[in-house]
């Protein structure tokens, strides 16, 4: 069954909601990177956040990248997403697997750490991308995304992200929701939504009970004039290519590329997002070096 993402509004546009079921794409991502359970939960939460935030982009050419690194054993997680809800990502240490936290859950916050920052980089095709940077709040990802929206974009936001890792290390359930109060929204409405989110409980527990993201929307907003705006099919998809790798090699500059050429070896470049291998003979490196000198 394909993953799904739904965009909606409630209360005459006072509330914006994006909810996603991301089990398949998270499964694909953690298999590519051969993640241990805690690493799988960390990468999965970031992929889910990336998909939802990517779907907020207005142009097909816009790109958003999220980077979180709090100095923990995960050694940082990076995801890149697009307006079509495609996403890719990687974790610095896919083998990280900590003891359960005090709540008996996978210790994502401990793996990511709290001594660092969350970067949100939006590339709109201009000369310079827009970069937002906030200190890590808890390292649990959802709290940090909510903190970013509230502090950096002055948009009160509730974020719920969840990844349930099964005994065979596959992803049993994964999903997320981002709820934002639009300018001028009733403050009492925000309190009501907060209470309902508490009643909803864990997103993965909700989904694991046989319910869907449609049920989640109805549970939270059924009596608030809920309007579905759009439904999308998010996917884990890497857009790497030999041509892009060639451009990346050229971009490192003549000095560094010449050092690679002088080694006289065949170079193998591995895409950090999907694991695809690209080999370049010494002769091919030489041709790229000529292009740098032009």
UniProtKB/Swiss-Prot annotation:
Matches recorded under Pfam families: HSP33
InterPro entries per the UniProt record, alphabetical: Heat_shock_Hsp33, Heat_shock_Hsp33_C, Heat_shock_Hsp33_N
Cellular localisation: Cytoplasm
GO molecular function (one): protein folding chaperone
Cellular component per GO, a single term: cytoplasm
Signal sequence, renumbered to the chain: none
NCBIfam families per record: PRK00114.1
Protein family (similarity comment): Belongs to the HSP33 family.
Protein name as it appears in the record: 33 kDa chaperonin
């Amino acid at each position: 069954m394909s993953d799904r993402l739904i965009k909606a509004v409630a209360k005459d546009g006072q509330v914006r909601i994006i909810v996603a079921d991301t089990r398949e794409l998270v499964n694909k991502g953690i298999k590519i990177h051969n993640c241990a359970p805690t690493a799988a939960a960390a990468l999965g939460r970031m992929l889910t956040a990336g998909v939802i935030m990517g779907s907020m982009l207005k142009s097909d050419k816009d790109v958003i990248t999220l980077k979180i690194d709090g100095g923990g054993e995960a050694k940082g997680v990076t995801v890149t997403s697009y307006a079509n809800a495609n996403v890719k990502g990687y974790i610095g240490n896919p083998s990280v697997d900590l003891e359960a936290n005090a709540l008996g859950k996978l210790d994502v916050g401990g793996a990511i750490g709290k001594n660092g920052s969350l970067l949100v980089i939006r590339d709109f095709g201009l000369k310079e991308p827009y970069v937002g940077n906030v200190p890590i709040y808890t390292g649990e990802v959802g709290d940090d995304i909510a903190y970013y929206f509230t502090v950096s974009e002055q948009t009160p936001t509730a974020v719920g992200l969840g990844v349930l890792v099964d005994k065979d290390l596959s992803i049993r359930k994964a999903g997320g929701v981002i709820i934002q109060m639009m300018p001028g929204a009733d403050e009492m409405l925000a309190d009501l939504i907060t209470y309902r989110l508490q009643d909803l409980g864990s997103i993965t527990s909700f989904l694991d009970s046989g319910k869907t993201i449609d049920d989640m929307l109805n549970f939270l907003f059924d009596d608030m004039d809920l309007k579905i705006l759009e439904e999308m099919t998010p996917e884990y998809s890497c857009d790497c290519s030999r041509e892009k790798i060639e451009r990346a090699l050229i971009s490192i500059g003549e000095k560094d590329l010449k050092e690679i050429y002088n080694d006289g070896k065949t170079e193998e470049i591995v895409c950090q997002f999907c694991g695809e291998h690209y080999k370049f003979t010494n002769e091919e490196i030489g041709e790229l070096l000529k292009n740098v000198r032009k």
